[in-house]
């Protein structure tokens, strides 16, 4: 049922080629970029699309508060941090596809959801399994399947 959302839109949600420093035209391209570590600017780009009260929450899913300044100085995230950021961008892309509105997508991502044990979808992006749960829910909503 689930497939990867449009990789170009995911890359765009990470800041596009201007922020990423390269063109991302396939999942393989994105995988290589994540494996090298995404630019810190991609985190800033993703975070600025969330409501002010959620920005710190999103940052902490990607990078612990104690490490944030160091990553900013280095200018690059570690691969594991990049994976978490990619998951957030992927969920945002899929939510925007389902809700057809960036505002509605952000509302969905940051509000507790009963099908996710009253956890906010964005909080589940910290792990691959949590992300899969959110993706499954979004695909069911997209295809009008029972949730």
Map each language-model feature to its residues.
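Non-transmembrane "mature" sequence context
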Residues: 1-147
């Amino acid at each position: 049922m689930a497939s990867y959302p449009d990789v170009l839109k995911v890359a765009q949600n990470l800041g596009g080629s201007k922020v990423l420093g390269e063109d991302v035209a396939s999942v393989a391209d994105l995988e290589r970029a994540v494996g090298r570590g995404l630019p810190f600017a991609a985190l800033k780009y993703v975070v600025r699309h969330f409501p002010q009260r959620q920005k710190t929450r999103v940052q902490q899913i990607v990078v612990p508060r104690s490490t944030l300044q160091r990553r900013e100085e280095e200018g690059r995230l570690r691969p594991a941090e990049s994976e978490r950021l990619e998951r957030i961008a992927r969920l945002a892309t899929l939510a925007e596809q389902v809700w057809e509105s960036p505002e509605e997508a952000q509302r969905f991502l940051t509000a507790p959801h009963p099908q996710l044990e009253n956890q906010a979808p964005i909080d589940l992006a910290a792990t691959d399994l949590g992300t899969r749960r959110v993706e499954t829910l979004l695909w069911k909503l997209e295809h009008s399947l029972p949730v």
